[in-house]
Amino acid sequence: MGAINQGISLFDESQTVINPINTNHLGFFFSFPSHSTLSSSSSSSSSSPSSLVSPFLGHNSLNSFLHNNPSSFISHPQDSINLMTNLPETLISSLSSSKQRDDHDGFLNLDHHRLTGSISSQRPLSNPWAWSCQAGYGSSQKNNHGSEIDVDDNDDEVGDGGGINDDDNGRHHHHDTPSRHDKHNTASLGVVSSLKMKKLKTRRKVREPRFCFKTLSEVDVLDDGYRWRKYGQKVVKNTQHPRSYYRCTQDKCRVKKRVERLADDPRMVITTYEGRHLHSPSNHLDDDSLSTSHLHPPLSNFFW
């Protein structure tokens, strides 16, 4: 009974010592007398004179330890004494385990950040030309092999064909894109061709005025004072007489005429003029030339 009372009083002393409410002390010291008569094992374990058990333990660590193990001090005093003897090792192991867990979490977070950073750096861009197009000037990008890739600021028209594609082996295939000079040339050619087509259409639409004359004559070509050159002939339906086409022989004169016979009355000659003459008739020129030739005979006559 004396040993049990001594153990209970010892438990009371230790409980007063490790009271977590007392915050005036920076640390807690636990000492056990060497003449304890609880048991032979306890006397052998406490044979050394009063030794320090837990020097300068933190207040938060001790509170957490007492909060996690409250029932051991109430129900089993002997177990609480053994627990008090092993208190430094338990606290140190708990602190080391919490520190290792924090370090492990830190390493995991660091590895996660490194992994996400490497994945984001290795992930290919869906549209590598978008930044250069918005910035308005050319830039250069490096691929995984270290070679530079020049980016043109007019690649917005590449669409599906432009850009860099990665295959399964990680090699880059560069698609040929038209340069700015080629695009400018094609655009200029397109503009020129469209202008030419417009001019041709306007020429086709504009027609010279036509004048038609009907005369009774046995000769197809009538003498109208101008010189003509025949350039075509066409067979007309329902008549045996073909249609003839003539052009004025004067330089820069675009007047044409068409001569044909009337289908109902072949004696009638229909002459159609297209355009107007900008010069005097050729007969007057011939008359002038003849008059000058009579007044001034050619030089060849003097050599005979």
From Swiss-Prot:
Biological process (GO), any one: regulation of lignin biosynthetic process
PROSITE patterns, A to Z: WRKY
DNA-binding region, residues: 217-282
GO molecular function (one): RNA polymerase II cis-regulatory region sequence-specific DNA binding
Pfam families: WRKY
Highest taxon listed in the record's lineage: Eukaryota
Subcellular localization: Nucleus
Compositional bias (Acidic residues): 149-159
High-level lineage: Eukaryota, Viridiplantae, Streptophyta, Embryophyta, Tracheophyta
Name used for this protein in its record: Probable WRKY transcription factor 13
